[in-house]
């Protein structure tokens, strides 16, 4: 078996140590390690993290391969330091059967760049009317444990209750896209001062908050797990905080873009800033950062949403919603959370690896960097600063809101079970 010696890495941001990989596992962590014939990677004080886990990725295959494929999406994931991603169900056909989730899972196995765990749809066709084959998807080769109609809300309270009851049997989780559809008809951006000035249809915070309030109460009533996708408002934070104080089994995520960007950017009418849920206010951004720091929000998830050029290069009203994020997520988290002192690197590992792996039951991921553990690792040059150039993305799509923006940090190496998928910033 091949061996790799990572020399002088700051494990979770601590003091420099050596990490020896033997085959698929970490053999040793310490100082002055040596191994005959090992490939040596001089970390020179770079930060070593467990491989990142994304609980919310859109890989688009099957059906929208013009936006992304499992292969290109997992290459983007490896470039961003991810070793495991959860693929949302809003594909064509929808991932609402054992056959479709197994197809996505097998495509991930074949890619070799990143493990792919499919997310199953809650309802047939994402139509919100009838439960999908939750049990069959769980029992399939893909072993689905997370279910979501993301892109749409499970708006019917009876359907949501039944889904929570069903997944409780195997400790699954329903990941809710919190958006009350009647309150967001014709919505184009956050409802507030900017939407009023621009004359664009407003997307009120209560459309998100009302669904979260309902669903945490349903989860309490059923005694099941619920996960809230992409929190975007200060009010949503308060509801989740209240629910956790009652002992309700709720977890929540925030995207990197909601930690950094505000609705003021929509004044440019650049559709790259059009996203669901919409960019909110500075007050919301600060509340989300604080909630991620204090643990009210459990994890960072990218909501990587690739779109072809023609779906974004058009007038605002006609543009698709969504941003790519796998290749910039860690840099945005460093800028908003680490460089501001809100989180240390151990906190980043917790929010971007340990906890998402736990929520999604991702076996072998989100593990400590210690002897005997799977060698799923990410090496980060935290001292680096550079401009984002989407021309260099591994993703098939380029719809990033950060083009030309200077961000800190760069992933230099990623290892998936001991195999280097990224070396010196280049995919293998």
From Swiss-Prot:
Pfam families this protein is in?
Amidohydro_1 (PF01979)
Q: What is its EC number?
A: 3.5.2.3
What is the enzyme's class at the highest EC level? hydrolase
Indicate the residues that form the catalytic site. 303
Q: In which pathway does it act?
A: Pyrimidine metabolism; UMP biosynthesis via de novo pathway; (S)-dihydroorotate from bicarbonate: step 3/3
* Sample GO molecular function, one term: zinc ion binding
Residues at which Zn(2+) 1 binds: 56, 58, 150, 303
Residues reported in the UniProt entry to bind Zn(2+) 2 = 150, 177, 230
Q: Which SUPFAM superfamilies does its entry note?
A: Composite domain of metallo-dependent hydrolases (SSF51338), Metallo-dependent hydrolases (SSF51556)
Cofactor(s) demanded: Zn(2+)
Cofactor binding description:
Binds 2 Zn(2+) ions per subunit.
Q: Which residues bind substrate?
A: 58-60, 90, 276, 307
Keywords (alphabetical) are:
Hydrolase, Metal-binding, Pyrimidine biosynthesis, Zinc
This protein's GO CC annotations: cytoplasm
Alphabetical list of InterPro entries matching this protein: Amidohydro-rel, DHOase, DHOase/Allantoinase_Hydrolase, Dihydroorotase_CS, Metal-dep_hydrolase_composite, Metal_Hydrolase
GO BP: 'de novo' UMP biosynthetic process; purine nucleobase catabolic process
Catalytic activity line of the entry: (S)-dihydroorotate + H2O = N-carbamoyl-L-aspartate + H(+)
- What does the UniProt record say this protein does? Catalyzes the reversible cyclization of carbamoyl aspartate to dihydroorotate.
Q: Which family does it belong to?
A: Belongs to the metallo-dependent hydrolases superfamily. DHOase family. Class I DHOase subfamily.
Protein name (database record): Dihydroorotase
What is the organism field in this record?
Streptomyces coelicolor (strain ATCC BAA-471 / A3(2) / M145)
């Amino acid at each position: 078996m091949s061996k790799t010696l990572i020399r002088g890495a700051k494990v979770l941001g601590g003091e420099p140590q050596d990490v020896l990989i033997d085959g698929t596992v970490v053999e040793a962590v310490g100082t002055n390690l040596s191994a005959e014939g090992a490939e040596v990677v001089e970390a020179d004080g770079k930060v070593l993290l467990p491989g990142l886990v994304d609980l919310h990725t859109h890989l688009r295959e099957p059906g929208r391969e013009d936006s992304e494929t499992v292969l290109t999406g997992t290459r983007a994931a490896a470039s961003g330091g991810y070793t495991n991603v959860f693929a949302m169900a809003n594909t064509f056909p929808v991932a609402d059967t054992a056959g479709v989730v197994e197809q996505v899972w097998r495509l991930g196995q074949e890619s070799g760049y990143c493990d792919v765990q499919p997310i199953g749809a809650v309802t047939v066709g994402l139509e919100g009317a009838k439960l999908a084959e939750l049990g069959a998807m769980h029992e399939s080769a893909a072993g689905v444990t997370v279910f979501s109609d993301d892109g749409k809300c499970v708006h019917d309270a009876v359907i949501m209750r039944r889904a929570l009851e069903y997944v409780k049997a195997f400790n699954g989780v329903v990941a809710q896209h919190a958006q009350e559809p009647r309150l967001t008809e014709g919505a184009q951006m956050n409802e507030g001062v900017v939407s009023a000035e621009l004359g664009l249809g407003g997307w009120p915070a209560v459309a998100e908050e009302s669904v979260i309030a309902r669903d945490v109460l349903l989860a309490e009533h059923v005694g099941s797990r619920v996960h809230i996708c992409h929190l975007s408002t200060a009010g949503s934070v308060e509801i989740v905080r209240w629910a956790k104080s009652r002992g309700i089994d709720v977890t929540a995520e925030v995207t990197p873009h909601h930690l950094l960007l505000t609705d003021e950017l929509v004044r440019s009418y650049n559709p790259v800033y059009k996203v669901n849920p919409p960019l909110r206010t500075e007050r919301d951004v600060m509340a989300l950062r604080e909630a991620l720091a204090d643990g009210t929000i459990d994890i960072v998830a990218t909501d990587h949403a690739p779109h072809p050029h023609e779906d974004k290069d058009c007038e605002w009203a006609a543009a698709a919603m969504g941003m790519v994020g796998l290749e910039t997520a860690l840099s945005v988290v460093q800028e908003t959370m680490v460089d501001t002192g809100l989180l240390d690197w151990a906190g980043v590992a917790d929010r971007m690896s340990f906890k998402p792996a736990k929520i999604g039951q991702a076996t072998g991921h989100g593990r400590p960097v210690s002897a005997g553990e799977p060698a799923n690792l990410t090496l980060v040059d935290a001292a680096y600063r550079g401009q984002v150039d989407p021309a260099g993305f591994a993703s098939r799509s380029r719809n990033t809101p950060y083009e030309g923006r200077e961000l800190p940090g760069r992933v230099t190496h990623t290892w998936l079970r001991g195999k280097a998928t990224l070396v010196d910033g280049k995919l293998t």
